[in-house]
Amino acid sequence: MTIYVFSQLILNWYHINGRKNLPWKKDKTLYKVWISEIMLQQTTVKTAIPYFKNFISRFPNIQSLNQSKLDDILCLWSGLGYYKRAENIYKTVKIIKEEFQEKFPTGFSDLIKLPGIGRSTAGAILSLSLDYFFPILEGNVKRILMRYYGIIGYVTEKKIEQKLWYLIELITPIHNTGSFNQGIMDIGALICTPKNPKCNLCPLIQKCIAYKEKNWIKYPLKKKKKIILEKKSWFVVIKYQNQFWIEKNTEKKIWKNLFCFPNFDTKIKTIEWLKKNKINIDKKHKKIQSFYHKFSHFTLHIIPILVNLSFFKNFQNSKKTGIWYDLKNTHDIGLPKPVQKILEIFK
């Protein structure tokens, strides 16, 4: 199969079956495509869609986003995870204001310098919004190329990545680049999936080596799963009437700049903090069941300790970034999923 035929098969499939109704494709702008591409890093389309809609509803353009605080962005990002992406959006919009007069840059060399934007993301933004000729190489594309050409190796290997970039640059058409890029990503997401691919629906089936070998599972090779470590965290859930004490996490890497309950990695530290703040635990009080929260590299066993205060106590002296979170009011702050989960119990 020639390079032209490969790209034409992708384009033909996309025009008939492609996902053209994705929210960032309606009234398409550089800004919307940028937000969507950042959200889609480490997140599926299905999960990203409601977050994208809420984000654009609140910040429809660069100008409105520029008026925001980091807490505003983190609030809309709450629950989506990988919060560094939200910080990168905040940093990027400030750079765009200072260096590009609030106009989204259209040069590849300018884009790739912005926080959170690498070679593939820059190519996706420019090709999907302006139809510029820039190939992309994200997870779906890598998997398709390795299966189609029978490339054995790990996607993280430098030599494999170099080979894949070489191939995708040859295959990507100069015209209709945006449609091709979206098409090949759609095929990877809908058909050439990591598990149980729907090969009979794939436009590339005739020359696909993985299909001929009936052995798609080895393309790409998978590294042995590392043993997932388990860590513990004691959450002190301080409640006064309908309010909860939460503190901005400015030091720890996990959930940085999000608001959390006071939390500690040992029971001893938890008890010491309670004593220091003269807080007694009433064993008769309602208990919150412990639960697990998964990260990419470890699992966190969260043990909530509920403290019902009979009188208002101000903790501002110990933590200037703390607030009383009222369930009846709205707060434009970022909350990690476990904190949201605990608060939901009391709503």
Swiss-Prot record:
Residues binding [4Fe-4S] cluster: 192, 199, 202, 208
Cofactor comment text: Binds 1 [4Fe-4S] cluster. The cluster does not appear to play a role in catalysis, but is probably involved in the proper positioning of the enzyme along the DNA strand.
Active site residues according to the UniProt entry: 37 (proton donor/acceptor)
EC number: 3.2.2.31
Gene Ontology process terms (BP): base-excision repair; mismatch repair
Family: Belongs to the Nth/MutY family.
UniProt name for this protein: Adenine DNA glycosylase
Lineage of producing organism: Bacteria, Pseudomonadati, Pseudomonadota, Gammaproteobacteria, Enterobacterales
